[in-house]
Curated annotation (Swiss-Prot):
Gene (UniProt): gcvPB
Protein name as it appears in the record: Probable glycine dehydrogenase (decarboxylating) subunit 2
Reactions catalysed according to its record: N(6)-[(R)-lipoyl]-L-lysyl-[glycine-cleavage complex H protein] + glycine + H(+) = N(6)-[(R)-S(8)-aminomethyldihydrolipoyl]-L-lysyl-[glycine-cleavage complex H protein] + CO2
Annotated Gene3D superfamilies: 6.20.440.10, Aspartate Aminotransferase, domain 1, Type I PLP-dependent aspartate aminotransferase-like (Major domain)
UniProt record similarity statement: Belongs to the GcvP family. C-terminal subunit subfamily.
Cofactor: pyridoxal 5'-phosphate
Enzyme nomenclature, EC number: 1.4.4.2
Assembly information from the UniProt record: The glycine cleavage system is composed of four proteins: P, T, L and H. In this organism, the P 'protein' is a heterodimer of two subunits.
Coiled coil stretches, renumbered: none
Sorted UniProt keywords: Oxidoreductase, Pyridoxal phosphate
């Protein structure tokens, strides 16, 4: 049975909460907030008792897929398990009850946590300084590109171009464009690496930076990275690392040692904080020495005075690019990531990446016989398959992704990177056991066999999900995110 919208469960007079008695003088909201910011009519909020609210969202959670329910192999997304201890620590009253405008002396514990998290992230990536302010991966990208722009402006040599590989995440050219740059594509060679001849041909005095993901979205480590770094720096250009695939590098190698000037981290990928519901994310940015002065304001600093240690917010940063979010970043996500780092330590983080690489390598070994491997190189934490072989029977990658849902697995990332035809990008993460990997591989092999022997089974999938095959483009082209009660629709009609 279809679960109604929460609005459709609403009945006048049903309430799931009560407010405490007001203990301050009552004022009309119009006396406190300018009229242009006030609603003209009351919000249409549902009136539902607490147990119905709980049941509603529990039912929805059983209809959706999530990392607590099963493997979630989205490539370049690192959908690892989110440890529940993270939720315990982030809910501690000393963290959850804080207000960002409290006096600094009253939030020393929070500032210490943020400072230590910065220091650990610096060490992990070999950078000179870190800002925790960006609240998402793409937000971290934009911050990094604005830092690069400010650097070149201060040099008196503003530049016009950002180089972006053809395997890059779509946010890379988007971030560059928002920052005012023209993006220029760099080709991938037959081994799945940056084409050095094409890079040299496009590297001129107008290039501000190259944005590179390492390992790249094919799951292959850019083994020419030191040569790339030398080329960029000899040209007066900077090197940016998209940190989406950091889960392959922890404790093994560091972006700073490769010559990167900027890197963004994804706490919601590498450091186990939740992805769900579109956030909240966190995309801290680490920089080399030459970019420290441009980092967002305020900086979180440690002060020593005799035997006393304190932490403060420093707003006196004249060359800063300014604030990148309302306050200091998504603090509760920082607490979760801090907890994850404390639990693992240096050796544990290296084990995370080693196991992520082992899992991906094993899974590829199970699947390579039935699917095409377009770039057959040593992979790291993820890999790309092509569904071109199955397409000869009329079955596309999209169809196989839909069929996977019937077996309790989320589909991998599909049709990205764009340079792989009928692409499936698979990232198992370190969280999954060999048994789960084998279950996933068995299902993938079964689907490959069905594509040959019974293509209709795959073409009409999914068969067992609460909602069958959807129009994948309709919602994007017909956006309607406002609920209007049916009685209002009738009146307005």
């Amino acid at each position: 049975m279809t679960e109604p919208l929460i609005f459709e469960k609403s009945k006048s007079g049903r309430k799931g909460y009560t407010l405490p008695k007001c203990d301050v003088p009552v004022q009309e909201v119009s006396e406190l907030i300018p009229a242009q910011f006030l609603r003209k009519a009351k919000a249409d909020l549902p009136e539902v008792q607490e147990n119905e609210v709980v049941r509603h969202f529990v039912k929805l959670s059983t209809l959706n897929h999530h990392v607590d329910k099963g493997m979630y192999p989205l490539g370049s997304c690192t959908m690892k398990y989110n440890p529940k201890v993270n939720e315990v620590t982030s809910a501690l009253p000393g963290f959850s009850a804080l207000h960002p405008l409290q006096p600094q002396e009253s939030v020393q514990g929070a500032l210490k946590l943020m400072y230590e998290l910065q220091e650990w992230l610096k060490e992990i990536c070999g950078m000179k300084a870190v800002s925790l302010q960006p609240v998402a991966g793409a937000h971290g990208e934009l911050t990094g590109i604005l830092l690069i722009r400010k650097y070149h402006e201060k040099q008196g040599k503003p530049r016009k171009k950002i180089l972006v590989p053809d395997s890059a995440h779509g946010t890379n050219p988007a971030s560059s464009a928002i920052a005012g740059y023209m993006t220029v594509g760099v080709k991938t060679n037959a081994r799945g690496l940056t084409d050095m001849d094409d890079l040299r041909a496009k590297l001129d005095e107008d290039v501000a930076a190259l944005m590179l993901t390492n390992p790249n979205t094919l799951g292959i480590f850019e083994s020419q990275i030191l040569e790339i770094s030398e080329l960029l720096h000899a040209n007066g250009s900077l090197l940016y690392m998209d940190g989406a695939n950091m889960n392959a590098l922890l404790g093994i190698t560091r972006p700073g040692d490769m010559g990167f000037d900027v890197v963004h981290y994804n706490l919601h990928k590498t450091f186990s904080t939740p992805h769900g519901g579109g956030g909240p994310g966190s995309g801290p940015v680490g920089v080399s020495e030459k970019l420290v002065e441009f980092l967002p304001t305020p900086a979180i600093e440690k002060k020593e005075s005799g035997e006393k240690t304190s932490y403060c917010l420093n707003y006196d940063l004249p060359d800063s690019i300014g604030k990148m979010s309302g306050f200091y970043g998504n603090f509760s996500i920082m607490v979760r990531a801090y907890t994850y780092l404390l639990m693992h330590g240096a050796k544990g983080l290296r084990a995370v990446s080693e196991n992520a690489i082992i899992n991906a390598t094993y899974l590829l070994s199970r699947l390579r016989g039935k699917f095409d491997v377009p770039y057959d190189e040593q992979i790291m934490h993820e890999f790309c398959l092509s569904g071109e072989r199955q397409k000869t029977n009329g079955v596309k990658t999209l169809d196989m992704a839909k069929r996977l849902l019937d077996f309790g697995f989320h589909a991998p990332t599909i049709y990205f990177p764009l340079i792989v035809k009928e692409c499936m990008m698979i990232e198992p993460t370190e969280s999954e056991t060999k048994e789960t990997l084998d279950d996933f591989a068995d299902v993938m092999l079964r689907i490959a066999e069905e594509a040959e022997s019974n293509p209709e089974m795959v073409l009409n999938a999914p068969h067992n999900t609460p909602v069958k095959r959807l129009d994948d483009a309709y919602a994007s082209r017909n956006i309607n995110i406002k609920y209007t009660p049916k009685e209002k629709e009738t009146v307005e009609a």
